[in-house]
Amino acid sequence: MNKYIGLFFCLAIVISCEHSSQLSSFDYKDLKKAPVLSLEDVFEPIKFIPLKTTESHNISNILKVCMTEDSFYILTVNPFGIFRFALDGSLISTISVEGRAEGEYLIPTDIAFSKADNVLYVTDIAKGIMKFSSDGTYLSTVSSTTKYKNRQFVISDSGSIIENVLNVSGNERDGIVELSQEGDTLNYVPNNLFFDCVTPIALPNHHSLRKYAGEVLYNPSYCDTIYSYKSGQLIPKYAFNFPHHITKEDLRDFYSNISDKQFIMEFAEDSKNLYLSIFDRSWNYSHYVLKKTDGIICRGDFRLSDSFDTEFSPRWQNESWLIDVLDPSTINYGYTRDITDDARQRAYSYLSSVGIEGITMESDPIIMLAKAK
């Protein structure tokens, strides 16, 4: 599975990416000259947690991982499935099944766990926003006033549902919609960027919304700005001046232009750092760390080992824990790179050296947890 561009829905994200005079931008050309920090410089030792499933379950294509105090909830695609694992990696249960009956999902696009009410939320293209208890019991479906089908979302500390609307043709009214538990619209951020799609697209592995310490951060796909969101307001927080940024014309036929562009692919923030994974032309990815103590940005060499090229990337987050997944079959090499048996064996030897024995191409994915030093 390609780590970043695994599954494309026929949709496009269109949110205004205008710069604000309130924000100091970082010039990406300067970042390329920044000093380099290793994985060990930035994080405590990585925790590796091999998942343990049975032959009847396929979890090789992971779209989302939610971590709670006692579990991992994992959303997979091809086939669709939602699984609950203990923190030691053992399978506890499945969450519902794919189907048309009440309480079953058809095409889930995101999951989120609310610690406040101990509820797992599942957004589904066909069903809306479904709610399950922590043990997987179906509770209800939120009757949304919006008509948008494909969503990414977070649950605020107050219990509201903050959706990132993934647009279809570049002419939708809203960018973010904030809903009550009853499905009423509390706030929304209008979409100010309109275009005609030649080839509608979306990057489902780009998670536009993050939440840390009660703050909701928002980075529209293909946008160079990260915002803080609150009650219908977007406040620019970080911006990056990319020499090869994405334009409105690029969005009309994104597949034809992506290989020559630069944009934020993944981001996360904790009390110490801002973490960035930048799509940097020709299908390359570069990692950066903004240290809050001194405001210095460094490049990140986040390879697990010098012996092979698999990197840690902050794909998901639970408070101060940053989460990634290692797929033993691909060792997270993208489809533009050759995966040799030698590289796989070096990866498996490294895992053995950190206490993860017996990994093969057929092994289940391995959760990787990192926390800043």
Model-identified regions with their sequence ranges:
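Repeated scaffold domains used in trafficking and secretory/extracellular systems
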Residues: 61-64, 106-111, 147-156, 198-207, ...
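Blade/loop signatures of beta-propeller domains
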Residues: 20-52
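Short coil/turn segments at the loop-to-beta-strand junctions that recur within blades
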Residues: 53-55, 96-104, 143-150, 192-197, ...
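Conserved blade-ending motifs and adjacent loop-strand segments that build the rim/top face
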Residues: 237-259, 293-318, 332
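Short beta-strand elements that form the blades of beta-propeller/WD-repeat-like
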Residues: 71-76, 118-124, 158-170, 210-227, ...
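Beta-strand-rich domains and repeat architectures in extracellular enzymes and scaffolds
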Residues: 47-80
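Blade-loop segments of beta-propeller domains
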Residues: 52-56, 61, 90-117, 124
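Asp-box/WD-like beta-propeller blade repeats and closely related beta-sheet repeat scaffolds
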Residues: 123-173, 188-196
